[in-house]
Amino acid sequence: MTCILLDRFYSHFKFLMFSVLSISDSDKHFTSALAEYQKRLWKHLKIEDLKPIKDDNHQLVIQKETKNLIEMLWKKYANWQKILLIKEGKSFSTLEISEVLNAKDTVFVIWGPYGVDDKALLEAFPDMKKWSFGAITLPHGLAKLTLIEQLYRCTTLWTGKKYHY
């Protein structure tokens, strides 16, 4: 099955795009590693960092940030596969991720520090998938780095490059 997948993805890979939407103040501890993977995926990766909304009312922050995400997803990514990274999501192996991406442009959402109204997101985008890196809590920069490394790993699987063992 892997050979069939490689053949199928390799021919489509030159057109495949990934976008990562992240609500976060800073990834300063991960800048170097993020830059390295951005360089490796430069034709295929767009990262958009959205500034978190500052307010003591966390429910209001969640509501506003979710509204902003929905607007951006409709405006820029209406026809893309959408994946929300959230602890209640489903975990996948790298090989499963490479199959799920299925040669379709994909946007990933890393929500803000207080969470996201996933019910509102799923109402706006019923086909949105929910993925998880497990039940642990990660800093946004590390979650973004982990995601981008996995995307790079998938591309090496599709192109036959030696990276994933």
Where are these regions (language model features)?
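N-terminal amphipathic/basic-hydrophobic helices that include classical n-h-c signal peptides
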Residues: M1-L16
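A structural boundary signal for the start of the first folded domain, especially the loop/turn
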Residues: S11, S26, Q38-D55
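N-terminal beta1-alpha1 ligand-phosphate binding loop
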Residues: L16-L41
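Conserved RecA-like P-loop NTPase ATPase core
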Residues: V20, I83, W111, L147
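Conserved nucleotide-binding/hydrolysis micro-motifs of P-loop NTPases
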Residues: S26-D27, Y114-V116
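Short, aromatic/basic amphipathic alpha-helical patches
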Residues: S32-L41, I97, K119-F125
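S-adenosyl-L-methionine/SAH cofactor-binding core of RNA-modifying enzymes
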Residues: L45-K46, K51-V107, P113-G115
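Structured adenosyl-cofactor binding patch, chiefly the S-adenosyl-L-methionine
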Residues: A120-Y165
